[in-house]
Amino acid sequence: MYKIQLLSCIALTLALVANGAPTSSSTGNTMKEVKSLLLDLQLLLEKVKNPENLKLSRMHTFNFYMPKVNATELKHLKCLLEELKLLEEVLDLAPSKNLNTREIKDSMDNIKRIVLELQGSETRFTCEYDDATVKAVEFLNKWITFCQSIYSTMT
């Protein structure tokens, strides 16, 4: 009688592990990645708030889109990634001798790397954006709040 329950439990466990269900060690890694993402977003925000040249001042006029639904899950980070790619194109952050521009590029590269790691193999999510746009500082503040929320639910 207990054999069937035991076999069912084993089968369910194997199915969860095979489908990438979070384990305690992966949760710890996710927390570290979310914390790193949060720090990089905060660093980027500080650089954006204090532009030192005209090229960066264009960032303040750029309109960003936020997800239509309130971002509450890691899959929503795909929306952040898509908007950062657009910003990078607008700023044309090619290799530069300007330290501020290089630091912004490094922060954006770190953010993209971390988001890709957090997403893993999940590629099915499609971002739906709100019609209203926000400026760079508000955009980054909203994603910082998102990361803080995710981090606090994991602790």
Curated annotation (Swiss-Prot):
SMART domains: IL2
Protein purpose: Cytokine produced by activated CD4-positive helper T-cells and to a lesser extend activated CD8-positive T-cells and natural killer (NK) cells that plays pivotal roles in the immune response and tolerance. Binds to a receptor complex composed of either the high-affinity trimeric IL-2R (IL2RA/CD25, IL2RB/CD122 and IL2RG/CD132) or the low-affinity dimeric IL-2R (IL2RB and IL2RG). Interaction with the receptor leads to oligomerization and conformation changes in the IL-2R subunits resulting in downstream signaling starting with phosphorylation of JAK1 and JAK3.
Full protein name: Interleukin-2
Disulfide linkage: C79-C127
Subcellular location: Secreted
Family annotation (InterPro entries): 4_helix_cytokine-like_core, IL-2, IL-2_CS
Family affiliation: Belongs to the IL-2 family.
Chain positions carrying an annotated carbohydrate: T23
Alphabetic keyword roster: Adaptive immunity, Cytokine, Disulfide bond, Glycoprotein, Growth factor, Immunity, Secreted, Signal
GO CC terms of this entry: extracellular space
One MF annotation (Gene Ontology) recorded for this entry: growth factor activity
Main location: secreted
Domain of life: Eukaryota
Signal peptide range: 1-20
Biological-process GO terms, alphabetical: adaptive immune response; cell surface receptor signaling pathway via STAT; interleukin-2-mediated signaling pathway; leukocyte activation involved in immune response; negative regulation of B cell apoptotic process; positive regulation of activated T cell proliferation; positive regulation of B cell proliferation; positive regulation of immunoglobulin production
